[in-house]
Amino acid sequence: MTDSHYIGRFAPSPSGELHFGSLIAALGSYLQARAQRGIWRVRIEDIDPPREVPGAAATILRQLEHYGLHWDGEVLWQSQRHEAYCEALAWLHEQGLSYYCTCPRSRIQRLGGIYDGHCRTLCHGPENAAVRIKQQHPVMHFHDALRGDIQADPQLASEDFIIHRRDGLFAYNLAVVVDDHFQGVTEIVRGADLIEPTVRQLSLYKQFGWRAPGYVHLPLALNEQGAKLSKQNHAPALATGDPRPVLVQALRFLGQRDVVAWQEMSVEELLRFAVAHWRLTAVPTSANVNPAFSNASR
C-alpha cells in the first residue's frame, strides 16, 4: 500500500546483468521510494539494440526479485514506446524547436566535442540526418537532494544536442524524459555518472512545458583501479546465492545504519529494516571502491 504521491524508478539497460554498482542505484532508489511510502517502478531501457545482450532483460528482472526489490505495476519497455517518442519528435518539429543535422561526427570532434549549431539555420531534410534540439532553455544549474546545487558546463548546457540519431534510433535524453513524464516520476535516484546529462533532460522538460522531477545522484562504486563498475569494464554480475550479505554491503556503501544480526533475518525483514532506517543525508557523495562481499559478516 502507498499513501504518498512519490513515484521513483529504476531504469536499467539490458546490456548485461546487474552488478554491485547497479545494485547501489536500484537499492537507493527503492529505499528512497519505500521510505516515503511511495511507488517504485521498473523500466527496461531497450532502445539501443546494438548494445543489448540477448536475455539480459529477463535476467535483470530475476535479479531484482532475487534481491527482494519488487516493483509496482507493470515493467515499462522502451522498445514498445516508439510511437510516443515519434509524437514527441513531431511536436518539437511543429513548434520549431528542432532541426535536421547532417554534420559528421568527425567535424564535431574537430570542434572539441561540442556542436556549434552549424545546421541550425539550414534547411536539411530528414535523409541521412540526425535531429537536434534547438536549445531555447539552457539549464545552467540544478538542485540535487543529496549534493545541493550543481553547476553545469555552460557549453554543454547550451548545446543543441541530438534527440534522434542518424541511424534511426531515439536518443537516450529524449526517451528518458518522455518516459519519466509518462510514468509520473517525481524523483529520479540514480548514479553520479548521470549528473552531466541531467541539465539536458531538464532543458527538454522546459521545451515540452512539463514539470520536472527532483534528482538524487548516488555515489559510484569503483573497481580496484578506480574505474566505475560497469558492464563495459566487465564488472562481475551479482551473486546468485544468498542476497543478504550483498545487501548488507550495499547498505554500508550507502552509509546506512548497520543491520545487527542480519543473518537471522529474511531478505524481506532486512529490507523492511533498511526502509525504516533509511537516511538520505547519511549517503556519502564521493565514489568508493566496491567492498569485498566476503567481509559482509564482519
UniProtKB/Swiss-Prot annotation:
InterPro entries: Glu-Q_tRNA(Asp)_Synthase, Glu/Gln-tRNA-synth, Glu/Gln-tRNA-synth_Ib_cat-dom, GluQ/Sye, Rossmann-like_a/b/a_fold. Keywords: Aminoacyl-tRNA synthetase, ATP-binding, Ligase, Metal-binding, Nucleotide-binding, Zinc. The keyword Ligase applies. Its EC number is 6.1.1.-. Zn(2+) binds at C101, C103, Y115, C119. SUPFAM superfamilies: Nucleotidylyl transferase (SSF52374). It is an enzyme of class 6 (ligase). It comes from the Bacteria. Its cofactor is Zn(2+). Binds 1 zinc ion per subunit. Disulfide bonds: none annotated. One of its GO terms (molecular function) is ATP binding. GO terms for cellular component: cytosol. PANTHER family: GLUTAMATE--TRNA LIGASE, GLUTAMYL-Q TRNA(ASP) SYNTHETASE. Catalyzes the tRNA-independent activation of glutamate in presence of ATP and the subsequent transfer of glutamate onto a tRNA(Asp). Glutamate is transferred on the 2-amino-5-(4,5-dihydroxy-2-cyclopenten-1-yl) moiety of the queuosine in the wobble position of the QUC anticodon. This is Glutamyl-Q tRNA(Asp) synthetase. It comes from Salmonella choleraesuis (strain SC-B67).
